[in-house]
């Protein structure tokens, strides 16, 4: 009798354990992982943090996605690419091999995106670039897409501003030669500015510096002697602010123009009064809503973070929502099916405008021009493609 009772007790215990284990296994299986591939340390950390803020807000507002009538929780697997191309490749590999994500969001910084692009392609994991504007990010990679405008358009926009608004006929370029984004955007500006002026010698000089440089006296001494009408310096926010600050200290008064990477609070924090009047292209303006979701995003961002969002933050938000939209259209969490759904995106309404992707995985979007006034980024105009 005692033996039978003991056997019965053991069986009950086994069944109880099995019964507890089943729901846990089910819960684990009802998850879809979004890899967040961003520079959270290093020279580009402020940009990566802005995009991550947008992604986290989107996750807070939309924490699940329904597939096949079942609700899946969305988890973020965050990989810091450390603002370094080698580390970017390592971070991308971790997302694929260790985190086993269904898709990837990021990165701030075109060179970082390009470093991990082949890894995502080989693993057949779709990636949605947020603010990586260099055309090479998606070129020959049918697993990389994006929600931002491209540098050929951005460079043309700023060249037109220099020619038509500044009335410039001669320009100097100061580029971050170790940065793919800076080199690429500088080239598109140069080509467009020469065409606009009709002068092959409209660019007086193309001067170089490296990421993390602090002293720009050699380049700026040359700029001062050339007396350009305008200076285009499409580099990282920190170095660009230092360049402008040191230029003003040398008595250089020519206006400075830059790209989307300037619209980060750190640009004003570093440059202070010296960057007043600096003009840049940007992705979004809080006072110029483009879709019904624009105001939803701005209000929610202010409530969560206690400040107005940047253009890079809104792209983090939109990238997350595009991923959800693609999963719903695919009705699957299989990466290949998600990729196929992203590729045929048409008229997706994000907070930063509508997204229709072309054969390269790129959208056609407007650019905003902003100017630093009173220590803030102030809207000037919107330029349509």
Feature-to-residue mapping (PLM):
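Short, low-complexity disordered leader/linker segments with a strong preference
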Residues: 1-33, 67-68, 384-385
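Beta-alpha junction/loop-to-helix N-cap segments that form part of ligand/metal-binding clefts
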Residues: 23-27, 31, 46-51, 61, ...
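Extracytoplasmic "Venus flytrap"
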Residues: 35-56, 79-86, 108-109, 174-183, ...
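Periplasmic-binding protein-like
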Residues: 36, 95-109, 128-130, 170-175, ...
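Extracellular/periplasmic bilobed ligand-binding domains
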Residues: 119-122, 186-283
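An alpha-beta-alpha
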Residues: 144-207, 211, 230, 323
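Extracellular/periplasmic periplasmic-binding protein-like sensory domains
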Residues: 244-317, 371-373, 377-384
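Segments of small-molecule ligand-sensing domains
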Residues: 303-313, 324-376
């Amino acid at each position: 009798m005692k033996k039978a009772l003991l056997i019965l007790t053991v069986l009950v215990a086994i069944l109880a354990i099995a019964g507890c284990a089943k729901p846990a296994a089910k819960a684990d299986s009802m998850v879809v992982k979004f890899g967040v591939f961003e520079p959270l340390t290093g020279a580009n950390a402020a940009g990566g943090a802005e995009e991550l803020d947008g992604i986290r807000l989107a996750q807070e507002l939309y924490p699940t996605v329904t597939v096949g009538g079942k609700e899946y929780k969305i988890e973020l697997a965050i990989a810091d690419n450390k603002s370094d191309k080698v580390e970017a490749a390592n971070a991308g590999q971790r997302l694929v091999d260790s985190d086993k994500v269904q898709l990837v969001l990021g990165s701030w910084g075109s060179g970082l995106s390009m470093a991990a692009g082949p890894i995502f392609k080989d693993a057949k994991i779709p990636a949605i670039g947020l603010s990586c504007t260099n055309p090479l990010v998606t070129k020959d990679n049918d697993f990389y897409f994006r929600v931002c405008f491209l540098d050929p358009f951005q460079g043309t926009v700023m060249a037109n501003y220099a020619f038509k608004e500044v009335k410039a006929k001669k320009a100097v370029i100061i580029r971050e030669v170790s940065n793919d984004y800076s080199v690429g955007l500088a080239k598109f500006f140069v080509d467009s500015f020469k065409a606009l002026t009709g002068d092959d010698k409209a660019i007086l000089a193309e001067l170089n510096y490296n990421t993390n440089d602090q002293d720009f006296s050699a380049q700026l001494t040359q700029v001062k002697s050339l007396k350009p009408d305008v200076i285009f310096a499409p580099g990282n926010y920190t170095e660009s602010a230092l360049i402008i600050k040191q230029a003003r200290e040398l008595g250089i008064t020519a206006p400075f123009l830059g790209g989307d990477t300037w619209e980060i609070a750190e640009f004003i924090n570093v440059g202070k009064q010296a960057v007043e009047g600096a003009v840049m292209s940007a992705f979004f303006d809080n006072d110029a809503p483009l879709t019904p979701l624009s105001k939803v995003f701005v209000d929610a961002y202010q409530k969560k973070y206690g400040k107005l969002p940047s253009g890079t933050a809104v792209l983090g938000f939109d990238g997350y929502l595009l991923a959800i939209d693609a999963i719903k259209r695919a009705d699957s969490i299989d990466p290949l099916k998600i990729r196929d759904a992203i590729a045929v995106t048409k008229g997706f309404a994000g907070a930063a405008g509508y997204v229709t992707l072309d054969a390269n995985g790129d959208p056609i979007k407007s650019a905003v021009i902003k100017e630093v006034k009173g220590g803030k980024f102030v809207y000037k105009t919107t330029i349509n493609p």
